[in-house]
UniProtKB/Swiss-Prot annotation:
Function: ATP-dependent RNA helicase associated with the nuclear pore complex and essential for mRNA export from the nucleus. May participate in a terminal step of mRNA export through the removal of proteins that accompany mRNA through the nucleopore complex. May also be involved in early transcription.
Keyword Transport: yes
Pfam family, any one: DEAD
Protein name stated in the entry: ATP-dependent RNA helicase DBP5
Length: 477
């Protein structure tokens, strides 16, 4: 078979199809992942070979610019130190070493922080939350964390409870649909929730925000950029005390969102990375050259039929596509699950819990799980559909690509991402994303499964990620 690059130079030979088409009536998008640090001599996080760039919101202040080498330098309560050690966070990651002195300074200052997936940003803001809370007031809300999905909110709640397990008096509520009783309202000193539910609780006077000291917005670029979520975040912020400390965290901050974030968190200290430093080095990024849209599904089943992959996530574009691929894969003898926004809250919780525990090994999902969710056992992510944005999917979505592949290669482990391309549009979109981040993509061919298996297993069997890791074969851009 001729490769895709040659086929797209002769459009007549390619199958004219759009990304809204599906594998025999399927379509596409979704994602997954959880985890505490594993690790031997440190937190076990994905460490970088670059320095974090810091910009002070007010250069005239005496904000600390130093980088800590141990958590003990921060003067944290012993309960937090014990919790970090219990979670195997033995020393700060680079993002934690630079961010924590700034976030814990007094008087409190706002922060806009950008860091790769799996580098410890959640741990950084969780330590800040626990440090700001008076545990003698277990039922008085003092810190609020906002997340774009119930899955991520539940995960953050779990991390706070784990690191804060020795903090007597810590109570963490999840403000997600169906979780807070209308009779009791919020009775916790830390609240993690989605913007719509939080806003509703405040309006019904079931969430006392008068003593809130800290607001954290995780996956802030997505939260502020989406019309509905962005408006809800602003409304929630306007209901909170004017003196509240605001922390915005994300792996990506597109320019148009960055200016909005600076208004949302004024005079914020900022931490950022250069564009080419955003992709996680422990992820070997590949692409599969599929003969046509129809044959994408056959290639997918062949991939899972030949290899022992472990936990993996398949991202598709639509709910219908996720359901159709699940139906067809199960009919072909594969054990898979689908998770997307059409499922009710408790059912979504159970599906994700089953995936975390290993009861389910393959999760087909849309972008509802592309951000923040950590399942440390995920060794492969498949972009069945290349992420696109704009009316009619007019342009590639580089930020969503980065968040999707960040579901693997967590906490210093290695991982594989495989993006499926089948025509001029999908190939051009992936090429644009690769150029955007300076990625050398490794080509896989459905005509040589022995070679494909060697390349993929070469990565998965590697014990830990190295900064420059890639399989030992020729790369193709």
């Amino acid at each position: 078979m001729s490769d895709l690059a040659s086929r797209i130079t002769a459009p007549a030979a390619a199958t004219p199809a759009t990304e809204t088409d599906a594998p025999a009536a399927a379509s596409s998008t979704l994602a997954v992942p959880d985890g505490a640090a594993d690790g031997a001599n440190s937190s076990g996080l994905q460490e970088s070979n670059y320095d974090v760039e810091v910009q002070l919101g007010d250069p005239d202040t005496d904000s600390p610019l130093s980088s800590i080498s141990s958590f003990s330098e921060l003067g944290l309560p012993q309960g937090i130190i014990d919790g970090l050690l219990a979670m195997n966070f033995k020393k700060p990651s680079k993002i934690q070493a630079r961010a924590l002195p700034l976030m814990l300074s007094n008087p409190p200052r706002n922060m806009i922080a950008q860091s790769q997936s799996g580098t410890g940003k959640t741990g950084a803001f969780v330590v800040t939350i626990l440090s700001r809370v008076d545990f003698n007031q277990p039922n008085q809300p003092q810190a609020l964390a906002l997340a774009p999905s119930r899955e991520l909110a539940r995960q953050i709640q779990s991390v706070i409870q784990s690191i804060g397990q020795f903090c007597t008096g810590l109570v963490v509520d999840a403000a997600i649909p169906g979780a807070i009783s209308r009779e009791t309202g919020v009775k916790a000193n830390v609240v993690v929730g989605t913007p719509g539910t939080v806003m509703d609780l405040i309006r019904r006077r079931q969430f006392d925000v008068s003593q809130l000291k800290l607001l954290v917005v995780d996956e802030a670029d997505n939260m502020l950029d989406q019309q509905g979520l962005g408006e809800q975040c602003v409304r929630v912020k306007n209901m909170l005390p004017k003196t509240i400390q605001t922390l915005l965290f994300s792996a990506t901050f597109p320019d148009h969102v960055k200016s909005y974030a600076e208004k949302f968190a004024p005079q914020a200290n900022q931490m950022k990375l250069r564009q080419q430093e955003l992709t996680v080095k422990g992820i070997s990024q590949m692409y599969m050259d599929c003969p046509s849209l129809k044959e994408k599904y056959e290639v997918l089943c062949k991939l899972y039929g030949l290899m022992t992959i472990g936990s993996s996530v398949i991202f598709v574009k639509t709910r219908e596509s996720a359901d159709e691929i699940q139906r067809r894969m199960e009919a072909d003898g594969h054990k898979v699950s689908a998770l997307h926004g059409a499922f009710q809250g408790q059912e979504r919780d159970q599906l994700l819990d089953d995936f975390r525990s290993g009861k389910s090994k393959v999760l087909i999902t849309t972008n509802v799980l592309a951000r923040g969710i950590d399942v440390s056992s995920v060794s492969m992510v498949i972009n069945y559909d290349i992420p696109m944005k704009g009316p009619g999917d007019q342009s590639p979505d580089a930020e969503t690509y980065l968040h999707r592949i960040g579901r693997t290669g967590r906490f210093g482990r290695v991982g594989v991402s495989i993006s499926f391309v089948h025509d001029r549009k999908s190939f051009t979109a992936l090429s644009s994303i690769a150029e955007h981040y300076g990625i050398d993509l490794i080509q896989l061919s459905p005509d040589d499964w022995d070679d494909t298996e060697v390349k993929v297993q070469d990565v998965i069997k590697s014990s830990r990620a190295k900064p420059d890791y890639a399989p030992t074969q020729e790369k193709a851009a």
